Amino acid sequence: AFVYTGGKSEKILGNLIREEREKIILITKAGSVGGSSGENIRSQLEQSLKRLNQDYVDIFFLHHWDNDVPLEETFETLQKLKEEKKFFQLGVSNFAAWQVLKANLIAQKYNFPSVDILQPMYNIVKRQAEVEILPMAKSENIGVISYSPLGGGLLTGKYDASITSNKNTS
């Protein structure tokens, strides 16, 4: 997604996967910058596809809930993008359980694509997803791909536990 490294990672990835495209599941996100308006979602997906040098991604994520844009607008655009075969499965990142259910009610009402995959932060330290997100996903048969499984490096030893805080580091 553009928000990570200004899109450079997508360009690199696009070059690396050229020969192996059918063997991988390609994912991108939109909506972190500029919100979830139909115009912005379309623009961000098309820019990602251009950087990736691809015609489609397998999974397209909305980066987060947008209080300023009606779900109907966002999902109408997602419907058109899916019909154009620019993505095949819809994911949402950083949505609360109630937001996923509301999005799927709108999708059902208007025959828009429903949420197929959730992306909550989830690791051994940050386990809040176990309270509502994961049970809801199981109940609704929605897939889960967590982000930050290594806690931003906390669980890799990146941070030295022997260093204690003092007035100069807090």
Residue ranges and their predicted role:
Residues 36-53, 73-76, 100-105:
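Short, acidic/polar
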Residues 19, 23-39, 63:
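Structural motif corresponding to the early beta-alpha repeats
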